């Protein structure tokens, strides 16, 4: 993996630009977090005696709860939903304690796309959009590609296991029109791992839904595919890809079609075996206490500059909740 240690990261706690919708303001410590848990949000699986493993990700109502915190154009919301599903699926394949994140940063009308998932399945994310720059891409009802929205920049996947551990990041230039193609480029260049990624996000009669199907070719050793010679492994991988290619966005996002049945439709003739499912939940972790600690790290002059009529306002970019602080209540780091 192409990795490099990163400096400490606090996360986006305050928006430097106007939020995508008017934030809801709170003065108590913890915002009301939606009690949404998807028990089988990620369904890992493998194909017996074949070099194929995968994850089916379906966010269900969790997608709507996360995506509707911001009043973005549907094209931007679709991109954000795909990022959420992809991040949940990739995180489920790792053994870690902390958070795993996807970040795309570019010079386009959506300069920042971010999603992260903890080891317990708490998921959050957002897309920061510039409506003025985006408008030309939406002319005549056009739907811009992910590449057009993000522009030139980079795609990064980061595993953060806390302040006592190094953070590792795989980073590649944005290549490809869609987030699916960008992810494929990342795995080819950084992981050198054969993958198949199908991402879907759309507004349905039940609200926004987001889902993903991820396939990975694994090494022949270790019990998966070890009984097959190289040619047979190649054939098994090609067969899995051909079957996965028959999946439609409609099927992937269909709440009435259980995930187990969907996987059975695709792979039942290939020795499908379901592994332990993973729950996903609403995962914004902002709080008044945390943001107060961030403010305390600024100098007095900076705090004075932030204040308007004696009040400092901070908005969580993930959930779009705003917090108000009296300037007189914040003691800067230089004041001790």
Regions found by a protein language model. Name each.
Residues 3-276:
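Interaction interfaces in information-processing and related assembly proteins
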């Amino acid at each position: 993996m192409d990795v490099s240690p990163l400096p400490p990261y606090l996360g986006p706690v305050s928006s430097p630009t106007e939020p995508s919708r008017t934030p809801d303001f709170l003065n108590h410590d913890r915002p009301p977090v939606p009690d949404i848990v998807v028990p089988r949000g990620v369904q890992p699986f493998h194909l017996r005696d074949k070099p194929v493993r995968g994850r089916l990700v379906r966010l269900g109502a969790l997608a709507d709860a996360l995506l509707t915190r911001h009043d973005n154009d549907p094209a931007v919301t679709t991109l954000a939903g795909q990022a959420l599903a992809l991040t949940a699926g990739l995180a489920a394949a790792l053994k870690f304690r902390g958070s795993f994140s996807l970040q795309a940063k570019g010079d386009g009308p959506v300069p920042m796309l971010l999603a992260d998932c903890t080891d317990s399945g708490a998921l959050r994310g957002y897309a920061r959009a510039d409506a003025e720059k985006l408008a030309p891409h939406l002319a005549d009802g056009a739907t811009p590609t992910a590449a057009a929205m993000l522009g030139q920049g980079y795609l990064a996947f980061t595993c953060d296991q806390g302040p006592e551990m190094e953070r590792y990041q795989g980073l590649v230039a944005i290549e490809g029109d869609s987030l699916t193609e960008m992810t494929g480029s990342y795995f080819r260049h950084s992981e050198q791992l054969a993958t198949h990624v199908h991402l879907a996000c759309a507004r349905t009669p039940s609200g926004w839904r987001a889902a993903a199907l991820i396939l990975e070719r694994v090494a022949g050793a270790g019990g998966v595919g070890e009984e097959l010679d190289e040619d047979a492994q190649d054939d098994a991988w090609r067969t899995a890809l051909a079957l996965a290619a028959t999946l439609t966005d409609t099927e992937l996002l269909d709440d009435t079609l259980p995930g187990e049945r969907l996987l059975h439709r695709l792979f039942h003739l290939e020795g499908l075996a379901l592994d332990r499912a993973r729950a996903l939940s609403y995962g914004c972790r902002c709080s008044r206490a945390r943001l107060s600690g961030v403010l305390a790290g600024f100098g007095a002059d900076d705090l004075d500059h932030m204040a308007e009529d004696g009040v400092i306002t901070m908005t969580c970019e993930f959930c779009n909740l705003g917090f108000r602080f009296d300037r007189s209540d914040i003691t800067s780091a230089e004041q001790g």
